[in-house]
Amino acid sequence: MPFTQFLDKYSDNLAIQYAIIFALLLGVFKLTVFSLKFASLIYDIFLAPATDFSKYGAASGKWAVVTGASDGIGKEYAFQLAKKGFSIVLVSRTQSKLELIATEIESKYKVNTKIVAFDASTDDEENYLKLEKAVFDLPVTILINNVGQSHSIPVPFLKTEKKELKDIITINTTATLRITQIVAPIIVSTVENPHPKQLRGLILTMGSFGGLLPTPYLATYSGSKSFLQAWSAALAGELQADHVDVELVISYLVASAMSKIKRTSLSIPNPKQFVTSTLNGVGRRNGAQERFATSTPYWTHALMHFAIDNTVGVYSKIANKLNLQMHQSIRRRALKKAARLAAAAEKKD
């Protein structure tokens, strides 16, 4: 039946006519909102210029604090920020690794470095005092909250070892909050001081698809990253008036020691590719179009995030089930590999 005939049929029924008009207007509104979000996504990923870090004090004697700086993504943040002209405070567990990285940064980029050997799993007050002593008199404008830990392999929550559970919560949440409480006031103080142009501060905290979507078999890790999402957005609201930009950076998989993935692919960048996209996209939402103070910067991750948000949704039953099946499969393969290695070791003995 043509639409005009349909309307004529119900011309005397005002309730149905109003319902039809409302449905049409709602459809136009939804389509317009989706189109604007999709246009913003494409602009953010492919067309927007790279962020100018001069507003954060690049090449002007300012400092950046990078946690988890000895490997992977954290190490890459340190190198790329040093390349932009920031001196770097390197915070991580292993002193010897930090010393090598500091030497390379100073030699290659002619900036200063400081080292803080810091085991985030211990929640030791001496660690925090050591960090505070290292940074209290520095003009810090950037904090990269990169330190983190996941499960060794996907595991049901009821079978999670107590130490692993405690370490994940302590490293991902407690240490991140305590470090931010130490460094953020210094950032606020630095950008408050008179400058030729208004400086801004920046706090980036590493999130994860594991926090975006509730993830069975990574329940503790997933919960810790979800906590960071809410905390970071709340902190962003608090520090806006202090000229400090706060963002949660969401990633899917990145080839690194933590992910145990060695090969890159279209959806799995190496740390250099991921950090480049993150720093270039500071201030833009990319794939996180519906989320305040949040970015999913790497282009394939951004498209995946946008697609999930605009189809099944992150809290849907189907998303949870697919996540469960994927991590059950990963666990089975990991256990088989461990069994093969154990059998091979027994043969050698």
From Swiss-Prot:
> Catalytic residues per the record?
Y221, K225
The first-level EC class reads oxidoreductase
| GO BP, one annotated term | fatty acid elongation
* EC number(s) recorded for this UniProt protein: 1.1.1.330
Keyword field: Endoplasmic reticulum, Fatty acid biosynthesis, Fatty acid metabolism, Lipid biosynthesis, Lipid metabolism, Membrane, NADP, Oxidoreductase, Transmembrane, Transmembrane helix
Q: Which GO terms describe its cellular component?
A: endoplasmic reticulum; endoplasmic reticulum membrane
User: What's the name of the protein?
Assistant: Very-long-chain 3-oxoacyl-CoA reductase
Q: What is the lineage of its organism?
A: Eukaryota, Fungi, Dikarya, Ascomycota, Saccharomycotina
